[in-house]
């Protein structure tokens, strides 16, 4: 059950939506950068990229440690993709245009 809770439950590392403001109340989220650092340490990671919580565009949260990349492309009207190349971050739009938006 610990494995399930860690990876598959509503509050798991994979499905947790409490990082995003519109879900703060339903998840009773009160996260800090320190909380995010603990999760990243557990995962031995620098960032978490989430693709299941639709935003208007790619968003970065908690000092660029969390990326929300589901920008509504599934609706066929808008959308962006995240491309990471040579440690640089780009937004790709439906027209194929790449825009650098963050440097590491």
Predicted regions and their residues:
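Feature recognizes metal-dependent phosphohydrolase scaffolds
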Residues: 1-104
């Amino acid at each position: 059950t610990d494995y399930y809770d860690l990876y598959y439950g509503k509050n798991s590392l994979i499905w947790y939506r409490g990082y995003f403001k519109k879900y703060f109340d339903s998840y009773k989220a009160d996260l800090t950068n320190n909380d995010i650092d603990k999760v990243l340490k557990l995962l031995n990671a620098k960032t978490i990229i989430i693709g299941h919580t639709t935003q208007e565009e790619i968003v970065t949260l908690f000092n660029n440690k969390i990326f929300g990349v589901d920008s509504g492309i599934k609706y066929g009207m808008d959308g962006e993709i995240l491309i990471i190349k040579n440690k640089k971050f780009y937004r790709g739009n439906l027209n194929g245009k790449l825009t650098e938006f963050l440097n590491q």
